[in-house]
């Protein structure tokens, strides 16, 4: 695992992440396999990013009648997939935190200016919560920053961004906008093409996830 502490970003180096990334990059990977790989990478990034979570402690009674002190997941986690591609991560992450509220923000990009436009937003209370923003493709950083600005205004306890791929400019923009955000990525790519797509990238993650 490599960490770029200057940008608060961690590149998660794991054989399963690398193999899934190979599938995601391959233009011949069919929809179902793409969705499975995206969910798998989301789960592995969440695994790494949640290491620092503060566990709650409680007591349970075992089938043998003994009382045991046990750890319990905190009820502070909020998952925030950015539509559409973030839904691909949600599938992999939600089984680990089934009761966590799911906030949703829908953002489209103007294809000429590449500026983000929010067309949908449902945010539960975020103050004091550990918010995980799911944005598989961190390209210009415009969409992520539009969300991060809204979330940080609600004063969460922590802010984490999970992405399969990040362009260096996207990482820098996120760090400039919300430097407290911890970023976990499968890989940092070379840059962006003229349409704002990540290079070498994996294409349009939302289209490939949903078969559109
Ligand atoms: N969104 C995508 O789906 N792919 C990119 O390369 C950039 C943004």
What are these regions (language model features)?
Residues 1-212:
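PRPP-associated nucleotide enzymes
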């Amino acid at each position: 695992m490599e960490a770029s502490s200057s940008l608060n970003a961690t590149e998660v180096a794991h054989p399963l992440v690398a193999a899934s990334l190979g599938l995601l990059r391959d233009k011949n990977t069919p929809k179902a396999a793409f969705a499975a790989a995206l969910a798998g990478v989301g789960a592995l990034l969440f695994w790494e990013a949640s290491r620092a979570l503060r566990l709650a402690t409680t007591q349970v009674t075992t089938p043998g009648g003994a009382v045991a002190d046990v750890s319990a997941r905190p009820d502070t986690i909020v998952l925030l997939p950015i539509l559409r591609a973030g839904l691909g991560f949600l599938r992999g992450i939600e089984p680990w935190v089934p009761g966590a509220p799911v906030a949703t923000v829908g953002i489209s990009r103007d294809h000429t200016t590449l500026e983000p436009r929010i067309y949908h937003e449902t945010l539960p209370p975020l103050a004091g919560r550990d918010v995980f923003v799911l944005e598989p493709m961190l390209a210009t950083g415009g969409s992520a920053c539009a969300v991060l600005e809204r979330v940080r205004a609600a004063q969460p306890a922590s802010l984490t961004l999970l992405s399969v791929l990040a362009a260096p400019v996207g990482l820098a923009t996120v760090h400039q906008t919300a430097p407290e955000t911890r970023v976990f990525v499968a890989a940092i790519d070379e840059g962006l093409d003229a349409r704002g797509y990540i290079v070498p990238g994996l294409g349009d993650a939302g289209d490939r996830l949903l078969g559109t």
